[in-house]
């Protein structure tokens, strides 16, 4: 029995020692250290992006709208200012860290965050398939049927616009607004708004584009 136990322990130790280490694909290693407030940074860990949700994108968009950031009025997700806010949220570093970053660093951060968000649309016949199973109130979801968006009317749009205003948004072109997409998706599916705002960050562009699909306006 002692020999068997020792063999088991040895096997476990060997397995742990030889198990491949998971590489952090969101660890940005800099070509040269970036000095911020007297401290050198040789890398920036953006793994915290996995903890962000659609709500974080909504908050960032609202902040830029309220700051009257002209570039963010339409395709907010393509702007450097938007990426800065998400990167700060993901890393816990102050926003000034990203504002003062050299362009060589800033562009790499931008590329990594945009790459994270630009997942394949994977939406067919208005069925939006999720990148990973999503759990909400004890139930698992792998796809969302948005076909009923076609049944919404002008009153629904007005109600969604009023909801935007209550949430602190100035109503401009709603087709670019993340919260507006979540509101309409909720109306169409009967799922609460929180279902959509709680989706992982990388689903934000997918839901925005799916709700505004040209097929709904033919």
Please provide the spans of the model-predicted regions.
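Low-complexity, acidic/Ser/Thr- and charged residue-rich accessory regions of DNA metabolism proteins
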Residues: 2-4, 167-175, 181-183, 187
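Charged interaction scaffolds used for protein-protein
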Residues: 2-54, 59-65, 73-76, 81, ...
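Glycine-rich, flexible loop segments associated with nucleotide phosphate handling
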Residues: 72-80, 170-177
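C-terminal functional regions that serve as terminal interaction/effector modules
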Residues: 174-181, 188, 203-204, 208-209, ...
